[in-house]
Amino acid sequence: MYKTGILNSDISKLLSDLGHTDEIMIADCGLPIPNGVKKIDLALDFGKPSFLDVFHIVKSHMAIEKMTLASEMKTENESLYNVLKEEEIKFTTESHELLKQHSKHVKAIIRTGEAKPYANVILASDVLF
């Protein structure tokens, strides 16, 4: 058993296997998961665990080059948008429909219990050297 770090074995393995520019997604409980994409389901109840709880834990263990958000987040979930834009990570936005199409190409989607709209982010892995 790990003394520190991510205890969820699926997430730990996912992060260990990432190469430069590989992408993962952290999603709210309503995002449709595309066929063929690995789903790591953490959702226990509405809001539990929250998007931000999962995001901050993953961020502390992953080298992130950039993140992609739904452009609708800026107006439909402004509080989350404001938190994410303050992170020291480059980010781009695309429509929610494009983000759902983009999700077909990620290595895995980590499903949270978040029940607020547009609480989804695609994280592209960076390289440490």
UniProtKB/Swiss-Prot annotation:
Keywords: Carbohydrate metabolism, Cytoplasm, Isomerase. Pfam families: RbsD_FucU. The active site is at residue 20. Transmembrane segments: none annotated. It catalyses: beta-D-ribopyranose = beta-D-ribofuranose. GO terms for biological process: D-ribose catabolic process. Its EC number is 5.4.99.62. GO terms for cellular component: cytosol. Coiled coil: none annotated. Substrate binds at residues 28, 96, 118-120. Pathway: Carbohydrate metabolism; D-ribose degradation; D-ribose 5-phosphate from beta-D-ribopyranose: step 1/2. It is found in: Cytoplasm. Its main location: cytoplasm. The keyword GTP-binding does not apply. It is an enzyme of class 5 (isomerase). GO terms for molecular function: D-ribose pyranase activity; intramolecular lyase activity; monosaccharide binding. Catalyzes the interconversion of beta-pyran and beta-furan forms of D-ribose. Belongs to the RbsD / FucU family. RbsD subfamily. NCBIfam families: PRK11797.1. Homodecamer. This is D-ribose pyranase. It comes from Staphylococcus saprophyticus subsp. saprophyticus (strain ATCC 15305 / DSM 20229 / NCIMB 8711 / NCTC 7292 / S-41). The lineage of its organism: Bacteria, Bacillati, Bacillota, Bacilli, Bacillales. The gene is rbsD.
